[in-house]
Regions:
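Bacterial N-terminal signal peptides
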Residues: 8-16
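Extracellular beta-sheet/turn segments enriched in Thr/Pro/Gly and aliphatic residues
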Residues: 42, 152-196, 203-207, 310-347
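Tryptophan-paired
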Residues: 64-147, 201-320
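Short, compositionally biased
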Residues: 290, 333, 338, 345-651, ...
Length: 800
């Protein structure tokens, strides 16, 4: 036979995996002694169904689709069959079932020559009225269906198919006749064949005049692996039963694929046919590339075109013997068209989400997107820490209608971090990088004017998420009075810089030092706050240049409110109210109210809670919730000593770290001192730092400005007690800058040039209202210290 190259479907009979029962396997092609009669078989060919074509109403800047219309058929090329080739029959399997008992009476295999649609075969005689099935172009399957097999089992006959370019394979077909009279001599039989596959054709045209679109990939996604020869599967395939086909990226492509009964949705607008709004297993064409509008910048873009009936927006079924033709004219990157995906996806279609997304400013692509219907990492959230007041199921979705910029830094006071923030109809926030080489921003998804959730964009020329630099940390547990001794852990991978910083390099040059500060976080909150913008010994320091969504400069000590203005409640409802307020107001810095120390609010009349959550006193409801916001917790909430905290931090929806990272546990810095019986020390002999950093300046007004400090902070050995380089080339010297913090009492940025700090995810102990953190000043190193949860400190994330 003539060799034909088929793109998409390749059925190799000898290698197929059939879904047959053990009874079907039987003795194989051994037929009992039955009388047969010659039969003249004539085969007819049922034309492929057309899905119908309707021209869609559309704007000037959208994806132009006419589904099901096949005007101006594309010329034949390698990988596409001609009409004659689609009708070709090379071999047949004939199966005869008795209508009385629906069991197999006889089977036969025959080959046909080119163009032949008739054959002289034999069928069992004396069996009364029978149903005869003809399978074409599937090889010899007679041994797969044993004598006595039921018709119901036969209809389940299926094979696995693979993508690729086959050699000499015709399309599998099936036909039947249910009233063959086996008592008639010299009978004739006519059977109409239908193809057991669907045909998908893509005709892609170029953009508007002046625009440019470069194709990087054309794929057919969610293709069923299993081909049922006889009749359709009863249900849609599972995700494990799906595969994808690729192409050579030419503008005219054809695939032949098994049917996929994906189902229907109640949709009336073609622009609503997008992921999350359609059946999860629906088959679609994915066109990926780079689009450059006239006078604009290049952007990564993808177009998702779901198959189905051409006149029904809600239909997603791919039926056998049906032709699906997609005439796609790429005409822009309209965010109001759900089929259009603009920008490089940072969230892997919603499967790799977090509250922080890292983008590399030196990449050619400046457009990005992430799934904005998922809160943080989408983790299941207990009612105890839920801002909704009820448990949030894993993967629960929000429904934004728009997006906006909350704040951004501007490099040098002018260069913007983000030039554009928008919301796409398909549930993505889309943003474009500005001209800044380094910066931080917060963007929000909203319903109307209400913020539903917000995310931190960390823009840096150093790396993207995949390239984040880490260092190995070993812990150094020891017996210390009043502390629990945890087990030692080694090789913990920790970022080599603060979250949001442009550099982790030790320096004492102002321009370089400020790059190391990163951003500040209040304990348990996901949204960052701008850090100090000076290298000086300063309290009430100026912050880096930062602007809100309206373009107004944000001043230091602004956008702050006392927690007692939200509520003075002490129950779970009060916790919910405060969490909800911070979610809806990511720019608002929450000040503590020390008046919560009184007994009426659960206090002891002496000690405030020092928390941005009102009245979070030890063992009280707000305190128990605060303990778990970042996934840290006490081993025993009633009795735990310092360091008796969970070391396996379970990332929550409030965790501020990028995907693949989480907040550190309390013991992460224990190698920073080497004293035998204490963790915290002001003795330089106990400091596990480079030699040049073994110095104390006890005057807090001088701090690290002292010339004896060669860098603006200290450099610690994360493993061992001497400088070393790991096999991967990373150093064991970690620099922690004197970046200061933002005070939870008045919102001022203090201790710049004096304090080197970093939050852990852990509460300090069962008796303390504080949380654990690294505390270093110019005259001490305290790796196991505690502080007020209303304060905002830098964060250094740990790799999962």
């Amino acid at each position: 036979m003539k060799v034909t190259r088929i793109l998409g479907l390749w059925i190799v009979s000898a290698l197929c995996f059939f879904s047959c029962t053990e009874e079907e396997q039987g003795p194989g092609n051994i037929i009992p002694d039955v009388s047969t009669t010659p039969v003249r078989l004539a085969l007819g060919m049922t034309p492929m169904h057309e899905t119908g074509g309707v021209t869609r109403a559309r704007g000037d800047n959208s994806l132009d689709l006419v589904l099901g219309e096949e005007s101006d058929r594309a010329g034949t090329r390698a990988g596409t069959l001609t009409d004659d080739q689609e009708n070709a029959v090379g071999d047949i399997c004939v199966f005869q079932f008795g209508n009385g008992d629906s069991k197999l009476k006889y089977s036969e295999y025959a080959t046909l020559t080119d163009g032949q649609l008739t054959a002289d075969i034999s069928l069992a005689s004396g069996m009364g009225t029978c149903t005869v099935y003809v399978l074409a172009n599937v090889g010899d399957l007679t041994s797969r269906v044993a004598y006595g097999s039921t018709l119901a089992d036969f209809k389940k006959l299926a094979a696995e198919v693979t993508s690729g370019k086959g050699t000499g394979q015709n399309l599998p077909m099936c036909g039947s006749k249910n009233d063959f009279n086996s008592e008639t001599a010299n009978a004739s039989l006519t059977v109409q064949l239908t193809r057991s596959v669907a045909k998908v054709s893509l005709n892609l045209t170029t953009p508007n005049t002046g625009d440019a679109f470069t194709v990087s990939a054309i794929k057919l996604m969610n293709v069923a692996k299993k081909l049922y020869y006889v009749e359709s599967a009863a249900t849609a395939p599972t995700p494990a039963e799906l595969t994808s086909y690729t192409s050579d990226n030419t503008k005219t492509v054809a695939w032949y694929i098994p049917e996929n009964k994906a189902g229907s949705k109640s949709l009336t607008d073609w622009k609503d046919r997008y992921e999350g709004n359609v059946p999860a297993t629906a088959t679609y064409v994915l066109i990926e590339g780079s689009y450059t509008p006239k006078g604009g910048t290049a952007r990564d873009v993808a177009y998702s075109i779901y198959l189905g009936a051409g006149d029904k927006p809600g239909d997603f079924n791919v039926a056998r013997n049906t032709r699906y033709t997609v005439n796609a004219s790429i005409k822009g990157t309209n965010l109001n068209d759900g089929r259009v995906l603009v920008g490089k996806d940072l969230s892997a279609a919603g499967t790799e989400t977090a509250n922080c997304y890292v983008v590399k400013t030196t990449d050619a692509n400046k457009w990005y997107r992430f799934k904005a219907t998922v809160r943080g990492n989408g983790a299941q959230t207990a009612a105890q820490i839920s801002y909704t007041g009820a448990e949030i199921p894993a993967g629960d979705k929000i429904a934004p209608t728009n997006a906006s910029l909350v704040w951004e830094t501007r490099e040098g006071g002018t260069a913007r971090t983000l030039d554009y923030v928008g919301y796409s109809r398909n549930g993505y926030i889309v943003f474009k990088l500005g001209s800044a080489t380094e910066g931080n921003a917060v963007v929000a998804a909203k319903s109307g004017t209400t913020t539903l959730w917000s995310w931190h964009i960390w823009a840096t020329k150093a790396f993207d998420r995949a390239g984040i630099k880490v260092q190995a940390y070993d812990t150094r547990p020891r017996v210390v009075d009043g502390h629990f001794k945890p087990a030692q852990r080694k090789g913990i991978k920790v970022m080599d810089r603060h979250l949001g910083s442009a550099s982790g390099a030790a320096s004492k040059v102002a321009a370089e030092v400020i790059k190391t500060y990163g951003v500040y976080f209040q304990f348990g909150r996901k949204d960052p706050f701008p850090a100090a913008g000076v290298m000086a010994r300063a309290d009430d320091a100026e912050i880096v240049p930062v602007y809100d969504g309206s373009g107004s400069k944000i001043l230091k000590n602004s956008n702050q409110k006392k927690n007692s203005e939200i509520t003075k409640g002490t129950d779970q409802a009060a916790v919910k109210a405060q969490l909800a307020y911070t979610v809806e107001n990511p720019l608002m810095f929450m000040l503590r109210d020390d008046g919560d120390k009184v007994a009426a609010y659960g206090g002891d009349d002496t000690n405030p809670s020092y928390n941005w959550i009102f009245a979070a006193h030890p063992q009280k409801t707000p305190w128990k919730a605060s303990n778990k916001l970042w996934g840290g917790s006490l081993v025993d909430e009633a009795t735990s000593l310092p360091l008796a905290t969970e070391v396996n931090i379970k990332k929550t929806i409030y965790d501020p770290c990028p995907y693949g990272y989480h907040m550190p546990p309390q013991d992460i810095w224990t190698n920073f001192t080497v004293a035998a019986t204490v963790y915290n020390s002001s003795n330089i002999a106990d400091y596990n730092v480079v030699a040049g950093d073994k110095f104390n300046q006890t005057d807090s007004k001088i701090g690290f400005t002292d010339a004896n400090f060669k860098v603006w902070g200290r450099r610690y050995f994360t493993t061992g007690e001497a400088s070393a380089t790991a096999a991967d080339g990373t150093s064991n010297e970690a620099f922690y800058p004197a970046a200061g913090y933002r005070n939870g009492a008045d919102g001022r940025v203090n201790h710049v040039g004096w304090g080197c700090y970093a939050w852990s995810a852990s509460p300090f102990s069962a008796a303390s209202q504080s949380a654990g953190f690294l505390s270093v000043r110019s005259y001490w190193v305290y790796p196991v210290n505690y502080t007020h949860r209303a304060d905002a400190f830098p964060v250094r994330c740990v790799r999962d």
